[in-house]
Amino acid sequence: VEDDPMIGKSVQQGLRQDGHTVDWVRESRAAELALATTSYEMLLLDLGLPGKSGLELLAQLRRAAHRIPVLVITARDSVADRILGLDSGADDYLVKPFDLDELGARMRAVLRRHAGRADPVIALGDLRMNPATHEVTRNGQPIVLSAREFALLQALLEQPGVPLSRARLEERLYGWGEEVESNAIEVYIHSLRRKLGAESIRNIRGVGYLVPASQ
């Protein structure tokens, strides 16, 4: 959530190049709508937003027991501002200007801390997925997936036995405004089957894709 177009665009592009799916909004109301309709791993939040401030949005989320990790990104660099942000529920605080590599490192650190608060592992048969560390194993052997292969597999594993439509999967893999090739989902499904086994993902014709509830 960033109202500065130069910062917002550069962060969005940098994170997408690192394999993240990123939605960028410019004010709190749009952020509220996005959070109400989409599941996110993390919120990057500027404090100096038009209308409702970032601090007000953060406090509102925490009052509603929203547990999404929040990394505050702001030009406010006084000790008092940092304390206020952290006390309002931020997980970390990064002062502008910043390096994108440092942003990525802080994001990973926040996600690791959140992963330690509960068992994040998704398990189905001999398949194990850790969304916090982006690790996948089968029979204890690591499986290397791209960021979008991981996101697609995670969406399917979260609802085993339930077919998900192509449109639903595209929502998980791509941010708002990103161009989606017509056969993108099929390409990622083919790659996942090659790595996990032909029967690991099934196609329910006219409905969507699913992972069997038992593997």
What are these regions (language model features)?
Residues 109-121, 161:
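The C-terminal output helix
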Residues 125-135, 207, 215:
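Short boundary/linker motifs that mark transitions into or out of structured domains
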Residues 135, 140-200, 205-207:
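Positively charged, aromatic-enriched patches within helix-turn-helix-type DNA-binding elements
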Residues 9, 56-59, 171, 203, ...:
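Residue-level preference for short helical/loop micro-motifs built around acidic side chains
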Residues 1-114:
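N-terminal/domain-start alpha-helical segments
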Residues 30, 206-210:
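Glycine-rich nucleotide-binding loop
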